[in-house]
Amino acid sequence: ILAATNRADILDKALLRAGRFDRQIHVELPDLNERKEIFGVHLRPIKIDESVDAEFLARQTPGFSGADIANVCNEAALIAARNGKKFVQKEDFMNAVDRIVGGLEKRSKITTEEERKCIANHEAGHATLSWLLEHANPLVKVTIVPRGKALGAAWYLPEERQITTREQLQDEMCATLGGRAAEELVLGKISTGASNDLERVTKQAYAMVVYFGMSDKLPNLNYYDSTGQDWGFTKPYSEETAKLIDTEVQKIINEQYDRAKRILSENKEGHSKLAQVLLDREVIYSEDVEHIFGKRAWISRSQEILELQEKANGKNKENADKEAEADAKT
């Protein structure tokens, strides 16, 4: 008997005993190379432009399942057909990803000039820090056109890491706080637009202290509930420790916020140019950031993995050719 579930954690333990569903296979979401192969399959029946590259599309869709990738390809074909194109272009695939991830554009939603300036500086702050910090996720696209429930949207390229260091977490938090830091530095006031950013950094800082043991005052400790359930009325630490945790979380966030403001101040001219481009065109891409700040000084993990995979494929082909040659001689 075969069965599938995406919530194995809530199954009755009796179901998993020997002689029942005693053999389990965990199917993870496809990684970079697997997404590239899946795109290759779904692109075959579509008339695509020469600019479309399965590797590029795979890098733009981290966390997508096989069904999500099929949906992207179908949506891109529909967008191209609506615009009367003979071939599906790279732009159509990017618009398809945007629509699936962020929802429909809502150009009918009117924003004031002051709101547009605030959103542009906020998003340019994220983009600037993401480009300048080694471990932050680099920009793919930013728009100030309302999409879904949001007044603007940004897409970044997260690195699919197996492990994460303290420095990587700090860079991610610093880039996330770049939006609010830019508002304070440029406009002299802050807005509610950073609420989601603050939620993310608070969770990250809390995890660093409570789960990852990355706090200076509470090093190498992990406060967890061994039952696997959410904490109820009690927590596995004292009130004194709880206060110390709050202090450490606030300290980590303050350090990265000050760091974000410092980097933005040092790159004030570039950030200002980026915000102006965003106001003028309503959308910016990684090429625009590269034009202002230059190429990133670091190779991404995704690029490194692709290069390693190409080397492995080349070595496998070389070995296969040698075996075939040896068989031919015998």
Q: What are these model-predicted stretches?
A:
Residues 1-5:
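Structural recognition of the conserved hydrophobic beta-strand(s) that form the central parallel beta-sheet
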Residues 8-20:
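Short regulatory helix/loop adjacent to the ATP-binding pocket of P-loop NTPases
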Residues 13-14, 27-94, 99, 103-104, ...:
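Conserved C-terminal "switch" segment of AAA+ ATPases
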Residues 24:
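Walker A/P-loop-proximal flanking segment of P-loop NTPase domains
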Residues 118-121, 127-330:
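Soluble catalytic regions of large protease machineries
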